[in-house]
Amino acid sequence: MLGKPARVLLFVALIVLGIGPLGSVQAQPKYVIFLIGDGMGLEQVKAAGMYAHGQPGTLSFESFDFRGELTNAPAEGGIPDSAAAGTSLATGVKVNNGVISMAIPGDGSELQTLLEYCKAQGKSTGLVSTKYVTDATPAAFGAHEPTRNNTAQIAEDFRMQTRPNVILGGGGNGMSVQAFEAAGYTVVTDRDTMQALDTENIDMVCGQFGNGPLPFEPDMGPMPHLTQMAETALRILDNDPDGFFLMVEGGQIDTAGHSNLTPNMVFETVEFDNAVQAAIAWAQGRSDTLIIVTADHETGGLSVLANNGAGELPTVSWSTGGHSEANVPVYAWGVNADMIGGVMDNTELFSVVTAGP
């Protein structure tokens, strides 16, 4: 039995190591699922909850224990675009609007993204979006370009440099079936072909659906829903015993916001929540997973004026057809989730993923 001096020394040592009662050091998450509602502000979340469940505060991720708000200005200040805000989320560094994960302002060097950080640890990686996959948000995680308009170069960055194991989203805009097949990817172009994949025995898949953003919910035709893409990505990536990083973007929330289309905005946000539910279902019972749900920026300057009950669109007003400077919500579940709270900057999420021994 330890004497009192030895017990005191052990207690101090445990605290120094971070495993005593005054704090705990967790391992880095083995699995990271990073879900981004493009253009999804606090009011978009409220509106979707009212429509889906009759009350605000009822979307799946709103039940997470840890939540906060993110500021999201670009390096030059003012209103962010998806390139600058996406880069801040992906790299933890501020850049100018339009820049994809390069130090601009600065020396123009490539900034390491969360996807690259996790890949360097031996993890599989994936990008999923309802926009075309070379659009700014997925590009920020898997490419390095001085302008978001370099879609052909972004596709080449995916294909030749970062090589995510799974890429699923809208096609065209620099994407090429033949080029990705030549680079070792199995390419699928519709929902049925995607869902027929042998997800237990395939590790390089590129879904190029159509020739631009996917259709608005709920009428997808032959194209997959966001939830179906997320579930497919999870089934492929979880074959890796070393873990994975998956970014899932509900991109069409933003498109609806730019045109002030209330029904489409609500339907897209509800489908985004369905994708979050798929992530939660996959992660249930695990102690090695981090789920982050957030947005890059708010689109439309939305205000919810009245709740009209479940199944009815709430009464809203829009103040712009562009982005706003509003803070955006952030929610976290799992490993390191307790680092989320209060008002944070979007650059801080990088360290939530990477913190740990």
Where are these regions (language model features)?
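Bacterial N-terminal signal peptides that target proteins for export
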Residues: 1-10
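Bacterial N-terminal signal peptides
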Residues: 9-21
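Active-site regions of oxyanion-processing enzymes, predominantly non-cytosolic
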Residues: 25, 166, 196-208, 229-251
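N-terminal catalytic scaffold of extracellular/periplasmic and nuclease hydrolases
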Residues: 25-171, 176-198, 203, 270-273, ...
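Generic enzyme active-site microenvironment
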Residues: 36, 247, 293-295
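Functional beta-strand-loop-alpha-helix junction segments that form "active/interaction loops"
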Residues: 107, 188-230
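Active-site His/acidic residue clusters
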Residues: 136-142, 211-218, 233-234, 238-276, ...
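Extended C-terminal subregions enriched in glycine
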Residues: 261-307
